[in-house]
Structure formats: C-alpha cells, structure tokens
Amino acid sequence: MADKLGAVREFDQERAEAAVRELLIAVGENPEREGLLETPARVARAYREIFAGLHEDPTAVLNKTFSEDHQELVLVREIPIYSTCEHHLVPFFGVAHIGYIPGESGQVTGLSKLARLADMYAKRPQVQERLTSQIADALVDKLGAQSVAVVIEAEHLCMGMRGIRKPGAVTTTSAVRGGFKTSMASRAEVFALIRGN
C-alpha cells in the first residue's frame, strides 16, 4: 500500500532478521548466545505486526457504511493506541478520541471502524501530529463526514526512557475539519464531550 508519503514495499522477513542481527553486533552483543539466537526472527515478526498499517488502505477500513439519516455527532472516546516514533523507533501510546458528524447523506460507519482506522494509521513509523491528521482526513475523504474532530493523548518513550527522560509526560494533538474548524461553538462543544464534561 502506498500513500502520499511514498511507496511502500512488502515486508521482507529475511532482510529484517539480518538487520536485527547486525544491530545486535553493532551495540556489542553476541547474536550467537543462547538468549539471542531467536531474537532476530522474533523482532522481525514483531515488526511485521507493529508496522502492518503500512500495508492497509483506509478505504478498506471504511468501506461499510449504514444509511441512518443521522446528522448529529458520533463520538468514540478513549480508544487505546500504540504506535512507533519514526525518529527513534520506540513506542508511543495513549488514547484517541474520534468524533464526526456525517455528511448530508447521513451515512455512518460502524463504531469499531473508528478504532480500526486509528490502529491502521498507528501501525506505521509515525509522528503523533501526522497520525492525528491522517485519521481526520480519512473520515472526510473516505466517509464524507462534514465535521471531524480527532484528539490524541500519548506518552512517548523517546522522551521518557532516553534524551530528556521525562516519563509520564503526555502530548496532546488535535485535528479538526469542516464545521468543527469553522465554528468555535461547535468546536467547544465537541472538545467538552471529549473531556467527558
């Protein structure tokens, strides 16, 4: 699957295993010792799963809709997300809040599709800002939503376990589209609901 960020090749298990083996050697480890013998294969399999979103298409995730003639907010809060910082290849994790108002057709998608959409984009080398925008844009482009609000709150291990070492710090990003972008009252309402007020 390729998108505007560039072409994506199929996962290469053998190449991934060789790269992990070389990394172990580069950091001073012995990949032949008992505890590390299977590590290259294990890490490669884990990365196949962790980065599975590179090979998924948002159109396939949002392909099933229902005609409910619903013109009001649909909001799913506190969807757990796990992603990988593209700068350091360490995890960031937290929750996504995804809300939308259907387009004029009143088409809605299943609630689980919102979680699947978040997972699909999270399972890539990512930055939180892009992840937030990709989810919002997919709901506009693929579902035809007239208004979208996405908020992600996440802890980044690249900040917690290395560098500045501030574990527990939470980064919040938002992306608003349509009416939530143009109407301050609508934006305030959806953000209050996201906060649980």
Swiss-Prot record:
The keyword Kinase does not apply. GO terms for cellular component: cytoplasm. Disulfide bonds: none annotated. Pathway: Cofactor biosynthesis; 7,8-dihydroneopterin triphosphate biosynthesis; 7,8-dihydroneopterin triphosphate from GTP: step 1/1. Zn(2+) binds at residues 85, 88, 158. Its EC number is 3.5.4.16. Keywords: GTP-binding, Hydrolase, Metal-binding, Nucleotide-binding, One-carbon metabolism, Zinc. It catalyses: GTP + H2O = 7,8-dihydroneopterin 3'-triphosphate + formate + H(+). InterPro entries: GTP-CH-I_C/QueF, GTP-CH-I_N, GTP_CycHdrlase_I, GTP_CycHdrlase_I_CS, GTP_CycHdrlase_I_dom. One of its GO terms (biological process) is tetrahydrobiopterin biosynthetic process. SUPFAM superfamilies: Tetrahydrobiopterin biosynthesis enzymes-like (SSF55620). PROSITE patterns: GTP_CYCLOHYDROL_1_1, GTP_CYCLOHYDROL_1_2. Pfam families: GTP_cyclohydroI. It comes from the Bacteria. GO terms for molecular function: GTP binding; GTP cyclohydrolase I activity; zinc ion binding. HAMAP family: FolE. Belongs to the GTP cyclohydrolase I family. Toroid-shaped homodecamer, composed of two pentamers of five dimers. This is GTP cyclohydrolase 1. It comes from Corynebacterium efficiens (strain DSM 44549 / YS-314 / AJ 12310 / JCM 11189 / NBRC 100395). The lineage of its organism: Bacteria, Bacillati, Actinomycetota, Actinomycetes, Mycobacteriales.
